[in-house]
Amino acid sequence: TLEKKGAYEKYRPDVVIYDVLGDVVCGGFSMPMRRGYADKVFVITSGENMAIHAAANIAMAVENFKNRGYASLGGIILNKREVPREEEKVRELAEDFHTQIIGRLDRSELVMEAEEAGKVLLEYAPDSQMAEEYRKLADQILAVCGEERPC
């Protein structure tokens, strides 16, 4: 884990992103919040029904943890899959949890190409439109958290 390896102390990150399976809302998911490593949680989802269901479960868990003094829900990020009524479904999810969609990521073949090349997209195609979408999302997350990205 990051804690056991001393990563928090060594790197002192402003933002840490945990990618967890949406259908597994369990102790591993909540540990960063309970240990004080998270102030805000952002839920990423597409408009697919199972993804919406999983995102709702995570948002509900975050709301329960917030009531115990842990992290709060910072917003929803739409990872587009181009399914029917996608925007509408995700907007309804955000409304149900009194939050907002803070970012939208278009579906991109470049992401899969980067993965096949063993790189992250910003390394694989730093000047691409998709890389710009990720930078914009980073700025939006920092804005919600009350921070700014250094120039």
Where are the predicted features?
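Active-site donor-binding loop signature of nucleotide-sugar glycosyltransferases
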Residues: R107
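Short, hydrophobic alpha-helical segments
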Residues: A138-R149
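Conserved catalytic-core segment of NTP-binding enzymes
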Residues: K4-K10, V15, V20-R104, E113
